Amino acid sequence: MLSPTFILWDVGYPFYTYGSIIIIALIIWQVKKNHRGLKLGPNRNCCRRHQKVKQRAKEKTPRARRHSRKEADKPLELLSIMRSQGWLPQEGSVRRLLCADPCCQICNSVALEIQQLISGETTLTTPTSSGPSQGSSCLEVLSMSSLSFDQSQESLPFKQLSLPSATRTVSQLTNQKSVTQSAAKSATKPATKSVSAISIRQYWAGHQQLRQECRGPELPLDAGALSSSSVEEPRIPVNQHVKKKSNSEGILKKQEAVEADLGNKLKHFTQWINPDMKGQGRKECILRCKDEKVAKTKTKKAEKSPPSTKRPMKGAKLEKEEGFFDALQCLDSEFQRQSMESVRSSQSCFLPLSSGSSKRSPLLTCATQPENPSHVSVSTSAEGTCLPQESTQSRKKELRGSQTSASS
């Protein structure tokens, strides 16, 4: 019992058991931790990304401020360098470089800004910029005066203005244009300031005269105007009369269409009452149309074909043969219809005789009922339709004769 094997076994058994339990618990804890990490991983990543974005935005704002400050300081540095080196532009040279047109407002404003930057003043302008400012002010005054003049012209009625006043206004406008051009040219030159002031005064004086002429004389309406107004007044009933005519024409057209529809309906009604008439009418129309077509084709061929032709064309032969066969088919169909009608009429005649005689004597019935009814029907049909057969034969002969004459 005191051997070393038993001692080791007694000591090692609980150690192994407790150790295995601890290892299993550690494995379970690790698995749970990994599972939680998988679940919470996206949220943590998103939170980290948001934090990074916020940090970048915070960093960008001071960078942008620094960049803007640097850009604002660059022109000042350049100006300081130009002043130190004596590279500043002379008066009016910037405006000449920008644009040759002295009336350009954009170039004038840019020249003013450049002059302000050069001088370092934001509120007051230098005397060199007085020239462009005067030019711009002159242009503004001229534009405002032209707008007011246009408004005054639009406010006045067109009839009150006469022809001499219109000619005066045109001449004055041309003078105004020349004055504006002279004012614009004078604004560019500082030496001719007095000339520009005089031209502006002249323009204002002419403009005031135009206003007085437009507002003051209010001429009464002439006889021509009254006559034109009297002519214009009765135009309304004339238009009404035209409208009435158009309405009456539309009503007449509608009535004609209704009458045509009624006529078609009556035709259909008569055909519905008498179906025999309907079939006959259709067949007669078909025959007439075909006869007319054949006649037209013959006349056209006779006109087109010269007398010295020896061999006619194949297309003409085919058309002639087709028309001939169509006519023959129509005649055959008409002949068959007439024969059927005659057979029906003969049968209706024989039936009462046979029914009446069968009661009295069987011999009469045998005699009246033949062994071959087909012969009887044929004979009756032949007897009843002698005239249609003759008419159809005569038509066939006529068509054949016309065909031979046309082919020859």
Swiss-Prot record:
Question: Is Disulfide bond one of the keywords UniProt gives this record?
Answer: no
- Keyword field: Membrane, Phosphoprotein, Transmembrane, Transmembrane helix
Q: Which Pfam families match?
A: DUF4599 (PF15371)
- Whether Phosphoprotein counts among this entry's keywords is yes
| Modified-residue entries (Phosphoserine), positions | S152
Membrane-crossing segments per the record: 11-31
Which residue stretches belong to region Disordered? 51-71, 297-316, 351-408
Where in or outside the cell it occurs: the entry states: Membrane
Q: How does it sit in the membrane?
A: Single-pass membrane protein
Cellular-component GO terms for this entry: membrane
Polar residues composition bias: residue spans: 351-392
Kindly give the PANTHER family that the UniProt entry links to this protein. ACROSOME-SPECIFIC PROTEIN, PROTEIN SPATA31F1-RELATED
Task: Please report which protein family the annotation says this sequence is part of.
Answer: Belongs to the SPATA31 family.
Protein name (record): Protein SPATA31F3
Per the UniProt record, the source organism is Bos taurus (Bovine)
